Amino acid sequence: MPIFTGSSSDSEDERTIHKTTKLFTRQRSIHSIFGGGKVADILLWREPKIAATLVIGVSILWFLMEVVEYNFITLICHASMTSMLFFFIWSTASDFLNWERPLIPEVVLDESSFKQLARSFHVRFNQILTKLLDVACGRDPPLFFLTTISLYIVSIIGTYFNFVNLLFIGFVSMQTLPVMYEMYEDDVDTAAGKLMRKMKKLYKKVDTNVLSKIPRGTVKNKKFT
């Protein structure tokens, strides 16, 4: 039966209050966690022009679909027709006005960028699944309860938004939270460390006052003949 000693635990927390623990006990930098390539540079705004263009483009797409209430197929068709009309006028006018004809690259979308994005997503998704399974096995009870509460809050928030809005919120979060965390990493790690220590102290109290007092029957070994 676990014994909770408040004074020793408090003194240990006081001694370790200034020791900064990385969020989720990570050992690598945020840039390396996101793959360390161009995708990480965009997410952390080290490529500001590309990141800003991506945010503006996705925001315009969300505005047209959710505010103007454009149908997705209709939006794609209208955008394609507008682009084709623009290039048609440009190509036709260039013969009469001595303009330079539009240059069409052989490769419009780079294959390596897609591979890097897929690889980064695959690695990160596996890390999340591994961490969730590790937490679910009860190896870190405070983190288990914190994760359960967080998932419950997200499930409640999800009932007030449709799928497109959730995707947009997720995209904006991915483009803002990592770079904000990188800017204020020490402050966030310190606050997260304090929160985890409080959660562990709370779990010890619950374990001592509630869980340890629940009667448990002895497990008898069954003999098979």
From Swiss-Prot:
Keywords: Endoplasmic reticulum, Membrane, Transmembrane, Transmembrane helix. The keyword Endoplasmic reticulum applies. It comes from the Eukaryota. It is found in: Endoplasmic reticulum membrane. GO terms for cellular component: endoplasmic reticulum membrane. InterPro entries: Reticulon, Reticulon-like. GO terms for biological process: response to bacterium. The keyword Membrane applies. It is a multi-pass membrane protein. Its main location: endoplasmic reticulum. Residues 39-224 form the Reticulon domain. The chain crosses the membrane at residues 50-70, 72-92, 152-172. This is Reticulon-like protein B9.
